[in-house]
Amino acid sequence: MESSSKGLLTQVTQFWNLLDDLAESNPESYQKFIQQQLKEGKELCAAPEPQLCLQTRILKPKEKLLFINLCQWKRIPAPESATHPVPLSIGRPEDISETSDVYTVIDVAYHPDVLQAAEKDQVKKDQLIRMAMRCIEEQFQFTLSNCYYVTKFRIKGSIQRMKQNLMGIQTNPADLREKMRNELTLEKIRSSTVSNSDQFPQLLLPEDQVSSKTACLIEEISSTEIKVEMKRPAYELKIVADQNEKPLKIELKVELPGVNSVSLCDLSVSEDDILIEVSEKYRLYLNLPESVDTEMTTAKFIKEKATLIVTMPLV
């Protein structure tokens, strides 16, 4: 133990000597180095921030309402390229009771660049959401509904709860001091840095071309989501008004020949757009002419006509 401490002290002394030499020989490089370390340290310590919240349902093992908070966190590594896996971090499920409502909340974090890129591309945004849902299913052995919608609020629950969940913050100061006293060694500080993206679960966003070196599971994900060319179905979109010609709702009728069940349809609605997908058959994405109330949106499937009707009240 004593020799280990001496060895560590020697390494620290050598490191400071190198910094002193650098400061004397090349002050500009020394300044850049210090600024870079401060920047990386700040990013490493930065807390996750809520980006958007999804509502869906857990079907198995027990049916429950589920909210997924998608957060941006600089501590999560960014993917090396468009064909590399996308790292993400998933917090533990938390069951929350509010009066008569009981629901589950799961926090998911991506690197900020990943979410910002998805905000500009609805297709990538949907892929990112569905990959997060798939990762949740695999990690917790859940079966989730294929349908989801983006809520009006960015986070379900408090920001403090989300930070504690993702960052593992201990709220008891005495426990935190004891943990630091027992575990805060230089080696553990080094190992806790997030320079290695293997520490996080990773998924691949589908691209037209995927590297042959990608893992088998990732190749399967890509092949099922991008290599099948889906048709754009015929549809009718109209705004329904009242007797005074005041717009009330948007009604969308979509013809889906060959589809005989609503369970085959994936429907995603936000205030400004709608996405309808039928696996390996149809895909329809539309920007809506008016903002709609996602919580009051309804959908029904007329089996005889193979037609999906979505009714979206205006905000």
Swiss-Prot record:
GO terms for cellular component: cytoplasm; R2TP complex; ribonucleoprotein complex. One of its GO terms (biological process) is rRNA processing. InterPro entries: PIH1/Kintoun_subfamily (IPR050734), PIH1_N (IPR012981), PIH1D1/2/3_CS-like (IPR041442). It holds the Pfam family PIH1. CDD domains: ACD_sHsps-like (cd06464). It comes from the Eukaryota. Belongs to the PIH1 family. This is PIH1 domain-containing protein 2. The gene is PIH1D2.
